[in-house]
């Protein structure tokens, strides 16, 4: 992760809270994915992504959230978004994530406790997940494939990206 972003997290009775400060991007989305994967594997069903201090989110970060949500929905779980800025909300909505994620749900178990939750997170960053070049390319590809599967519009929007990433994986295979 670069110095301009941080991922804080905490496990609470009913949910995993992940707070992204700075930019949510391809650089820190593997950390978010790892936290979510571990939580789901342990039986967790509700992941809350706190975007209050997030200055923006890229398509890889959004695709990572979509991937976690698509894993949780069939087992009765969900990904919820807390305090998104207008910029982050617009980015989520532009790719159709408002249909997949619960954005500021009024009856969420964390409602009325947000400040206490944030205070309980402390200041230590989540351990960064470092991927090698091939793993990073695969992560970015999978995030964009997830977004592409959501709508024809997304598929068209990301076709060049996914094609280039597939070609890059082929080149990396030969090295």
Regions found by a protein language model. Name each.
Residues 56:
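Residues immediately C-terminal
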Residues 65-69:
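Histidine-anchored nucleotide/phosphate-binding helix
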Residues 1-53, 70-175:
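STAS-like cytosolic regulatory interaction modules
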């Amino acid at each position: 992760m670069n110095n301009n972003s941080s991922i804080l997290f905490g496990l609470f009775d009913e949910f995993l809270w992940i707070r992204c400060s700075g930019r949510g991007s391809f650089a820190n989305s593997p950390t978010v994915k790892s936290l979510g994967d571990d939580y789901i594997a342990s039986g967790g069903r509700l992941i809350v992504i706190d975007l209050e201090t997030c200055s923006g989110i890229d398509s890889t970060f959004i695709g990572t959230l979509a991937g976690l949500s698509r894993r949780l929905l069939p087992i009765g779980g969900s990904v919820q978004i807390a305090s998104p800025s207008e910029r982050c909300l617009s980015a989520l909505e532009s790719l159709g994530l408002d249909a997949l994620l619960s954005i500021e749900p009024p009856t969420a178990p964390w409602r009325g406790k947000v400040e206490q939750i944030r205070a309980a997170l402390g200041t230590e960053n989540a351990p960064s997940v470092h991927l090698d070049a091939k793993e990073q390319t695969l992560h970015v590809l999978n995030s964009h494939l997830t977004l592409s599967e959501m709508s024809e519009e997304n598929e068209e929007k990301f076709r060049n990206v996914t094609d280039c990433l597939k070609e890059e994986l082929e080149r990396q295979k030969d090295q």
